[in-house]
A protein has these predicted regions:
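Alpha/beta-hydrolase fold nucleophile elbow
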Residues: 107-116
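Conserved alpha/beta-hydrolase "nucleophile elbow" surrounding the catalytic nucleophile
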Residues: 25-27, 115-117, 166
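C-terminal catalytic histidine-bearing segment of alpha/beta-hydrolase fold enzymes
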Residues: 162, 178-220
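A conserved short beta-strand
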Residues: 133-145
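Serine-hydrolase catalytic machinery in alpha/beta-hydrolase-like enzymes
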Residues: 5-107
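Short beta-strand/loop motif that positions the catalytic acidic residue
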Residues: 162-165, 169
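Gly/Ala-rich beta-loop-alpha elbow adjacent to hydrolase catalytic centers
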Residues: 116-120, 124
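Conserved alpha/beta-hydrolase "acid-adjacent" motif
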Residues: 170-176
Length: 220
């Protein structure tokens, strides 16, 4: 049992464990928010165990949800120092969480897929760039790339990345994904993108289908 981050777990439908998929929820949600995506992903990854942890902090806006980092900005729109520090702290916890899942399951992180939504996408990309062990693929919905860690994980330069975004998102504008692709390309990462027409801040059926098609091609 992983004690670093608590959340939901769903066993592989085949009973044969070869891959790990970890979902990272958005701001103010919890691990149960995304675990239902395992129904779609398990059709192409029948040997995958699915994890969906709660973020480490209770949401600053109240309620029962969690956050990977606080949404605090300076007057110029940049993240304040506390937010940056909390991002780095969450990344450290996630890396420890991944390491513990490796130990618990005997499955190498080279067979791990990280899937994020909104703030979860942002923290997944930060984790990818800081991780010193291989990750197979990243799928990010409705997020962006903050580059707080200011690192480049050379071992993960060939990690497959797909970023999906709604073209009518007024919470995290789709320009955030376009900028993420540009900045990740500059750092040496190749990024696939897909934009869902008429979609606001969410995950559409066509976006989900695109992500499963993307993962199926990888033949993990």
């Amino acid at each position: 049992m992983n004690e670093i981050l608590k959340g939901s777990v769903k066993k592989s439908i085949s009973g044969i464990n070869k891959q790990i998929v970890i979902f990272f929820h958005g701001y103010g949600a919890d691990g149960s928010d995304l675990i239902s995506l395992s129904d779609a992903f398990s059709k192409i990854l029948p040997n995958a165990i699915f994890y969906s942890p709660n973020a480490p902090q209770k949401c600053e806006m109240g309620g029962i949800g969690y956050q990977w980092f606080p949404i605090k900005q300076n007057n110029d729109g940049s993240l304040d120092l506390n937010a940056k520090n909390e991002i780095l702290n969450s990344v450290k916890l996630i890396n420890r969480y991944i390491d513990e899942i490796e130990l618990d399951t005997g499955i190498s992180s080279k067979n791990f897929i990280l899937v994020g939504f909104s703030q979860g996408t942002m923290i997944v990309l930060e984790t990818l760039l800081s991780r010193e062990k291989k990750i197979s693929a990243v799928v990010g919905f409705s997020g962006g790339f903050l580059n707080v860690s200011n690192k480049v994980s050379k071992i993960n330069l060939d990690t497959q990345i797909l970023l999906v975004h709604g073209d009518e998102d007024n919470v995290v504008p789709m320009e955030m994904t376009k900028m993420a692709k540009k900045n990740l390309n500059i750092l040496g990462y190749f990024v696939n993108t897909y934009f869902s027409k008429g979609l606001g801040h969410g995950i559409s059926l066509d976006g989900l289908a695109e992500s499963t098609k993307f993962l199926k091609k990888l033949n993990i």
